[in-house]
Amino acid sequence: SLLATQIVIHNEFSNIARKTGGIDYKEIIEGVVSDKRWSIQGSNETFIPSIVDYFQPGYGYGGSCFPKDVKALLEYSKGLDSKSLVLDSVIKSNDLQPLFVEEVLKENVDLKDKKKILILGTSFKPETDDIRESSSIKIVEICSKLNLEIYIHDPLSQEKFIDSLKTNLIGVKDWKKEILIMDIVLISTSWPEYKLIEELYKEGLLDQKVIIDGRGFLDNKIFKNNYFSVGSSKNS
């Protein structure tokens, strides 16, 4: 529950940074972890504790553990007649975090005509096929509501995801080929192979596409236009 709270509070801070303008939350985190209260200062190098991994903004936590554990502790506290306003807020804030996608789409995409969106990643984190409480589920709901034609790719969980949602999703095998005919590209899970988007952009193949990087996964300095990242106000 403590780790889940770290994720949520940094998501909220990153939302404030994005709406303030002129702020990149990645740079704020770099400054935070340079503080000796968050890192161990050696004679020649700084040792960064792994808890800092939970400072990175995104769509919110998912999987089989965090959602269940936070809810269980909240219910336990209620049974003790002990109010836990923080845990209650953690759950509510985490549920709202994917709305970042809806906000970006409504503000930056002409939705009058049907658009194609490629959602990259369906598992709740990379290196697993676990889709339980994956942010991709909420993202698909948002895209369906906006009448987008939804294409998805995931190295491990793609078929499982399609079968579980029972909605009109189109799975793709070669995302590097399909990305060229999309209007919108959204990174939902930070699989390493999706870093190739940076090279495709440099080659001029993605100039007219809206790219939504809800993991802050790509190097935002590369993009010149239509790139939207959580924790950054930069529409490059």
Task: Please describe what each predicted stretch is.
Residues 1-236:
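Structural/interface elements that position substrates and couple domains in central-metabolism enzymes
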